[in-house]
């Protein structure tokens, strides 16, 4: 089987959207082989014909991913489909209830907390980072007094992404990073542009936002996400693992990558997620992500004013993203349907989750290998099929 994740270190670093490195107690390398389509047995509580969706899922699998999960919720009714394998060694089939690393979908959780804090008048989105974290950004062409919370949320701050630096080693499985280290790595590079004068994806900005949440609340960003989102919504399969390399439980796929054009996929399931920090450390399931985006897009997680701010977008210049809001991006499909969500590429896993405004129709897709820099968008045709009018 052609491996989708035949990538160089450079392209891996560019692909990372809040990703983490892994901790591997026992690294195994397995040869990728043709995988069998496996549909999970699940509750199909709607009469809608999803033949086209199934075909789009199967087509995505043929791009070279070991396995894929797709699950949707529409009007309170759920549907799901799994294909391929969760484990290349044992040929264990993929299942729709498996947990996976969600990478930069973490950013939507971080943004939700900050918008809730804004709605509580505990901060202003146009506050400077210097106001809350004085001295954390100094020199090298940066002016912390001009960089705002809003700009970090929508990636217009100009802060360089630490994922582009060689010091952020996405191939080193055991390394532990602190948030301060990641920020230092990012700020060692000059700004991409003056604050508010461009758009450039910055994981560094979201790590700073995690530090800021702790400054404002006295609690870690993980505690705030748990208290404000995970517990109230009863997202029982959603975790912030911190420095733990383990995906909790046994119901999860193994994650794979093929570095530097290798024809064999390396098992990188056990992974120290500290390199992701508040930009991308989280673990979840398709059901939990659908529930989160349903609540978010229906306005149940924040005040109307804050949701309007979240959905106020700026151009990105990137076709695959479209326009970016605050921790969420807008995709306009050829069918005319507007989707709000986020993707997350994380060594071993790739994810998309989102839905329509109002939250009545959501979709979560996960792959147990990260897409390569030059591969087609693995989600585009699934989105078109699922959200066709």
Protein language model annotation of sequence segments:
Residues 2-27:
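Sec-dependent N-terminal signal peptides of Gram-positive bacterial secreted proteins and lipoproteins
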Residues 30-82, 266-389:
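Catalytic loop of the DD-peptidase/beta-lactamase superfamily, centered on the K-T-G motif
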Residues 49, 53, 102, 106, ...:
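Hydrophobic (often cysteine-bearing) scaffold residues that line and stabilize catalytic clefts
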Residues 57, 76, 107-110, 114, ...:
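Residue-level preference for non-acidic, small/hydrophobic
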Residues 80-82, 93, 101, 128-131, ...:
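Conserved beta-strand positions that form and line the central face of beta-propeller blades
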Residues 87, 140-343:
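Short, surface-exposed loop or secondary-structure junction motifs
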């Amino acid at each position: 089987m052609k491996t989708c994740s035949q990538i160089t270190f450079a392209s891996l670093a560019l692909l990372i959207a809040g990703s983490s490195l892994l901790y591997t107690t026992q690294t195994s390398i397995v040869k990728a082989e043709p995988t069998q389509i496996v549909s999970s047995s699940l509750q199909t509580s709607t009469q809608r014909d999803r033949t086209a969706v199934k075909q789009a899922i199967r087509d995505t699998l043929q791009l070279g991913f070991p396995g894929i999960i797709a699950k949707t919720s529409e009007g309170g009714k759920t549907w799901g489909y799994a294909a391929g394998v969760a484990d290349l060694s044992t040929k264990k089939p993929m299942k729709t209830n498996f947990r996976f690393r969600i990478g930069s979908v973490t950013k939507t959780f971080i943004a939700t907390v900050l918008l809730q804090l804004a709605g509580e008048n505990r901060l202003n989105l146009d506050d400077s980072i210097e106001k809350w974290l004085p001295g954390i950004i100094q020199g090298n062409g940066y002016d912390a007094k001009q960089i705002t919370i809003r700009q970090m949320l929508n990636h217009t701050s100009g802060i360089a992404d630490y994922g582009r630096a060689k010091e952020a080693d996405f191939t080193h499985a055991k390394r532990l990073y602190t948030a301060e280290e990641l920020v230092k790595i990012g700020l060692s590079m000059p700004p991409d542009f003056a604050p508010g004068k461009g758009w450039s994806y910055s994981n560094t900005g979201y790590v700073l936002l995690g530090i800021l949440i702790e400054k404002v609340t006295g609690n870690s960003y993980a505690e705030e996400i748990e208290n404000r989102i995970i517990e109230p919504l009863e997202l029982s399969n959603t975790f912030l693992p911190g420095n733990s390399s383990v995906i909790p439980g046994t119901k999860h796929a193994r994650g794979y990558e093929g570095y530097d054009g290798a024809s064999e996929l390396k098992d990188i399931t056990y992974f120290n997620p500290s390199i992701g920090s508040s930009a991308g450390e989280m673990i979840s399931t398709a059901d939990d992500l659908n529930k989160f985006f349903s609540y978010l897009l229906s306005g149940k997680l924040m005040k109307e004013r804050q949701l309007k701010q979240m959905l106020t977008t700026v151009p990105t210049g990137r076709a695959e993203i479209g326009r970016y809001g605050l921790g969420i991006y807008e995709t306009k499909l050829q069918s005319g349907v507007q989707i709000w969500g986020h993707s997350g590429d994380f060594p071993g896993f790739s994810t998309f989750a989102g839905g329509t405004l109002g939250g009545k129709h959501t979709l979560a897709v996960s792959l147990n290998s990260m897409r390569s820099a030059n591969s087609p968008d693995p989600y585009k045709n699934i989105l078109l099929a699922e959200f066709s009018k």
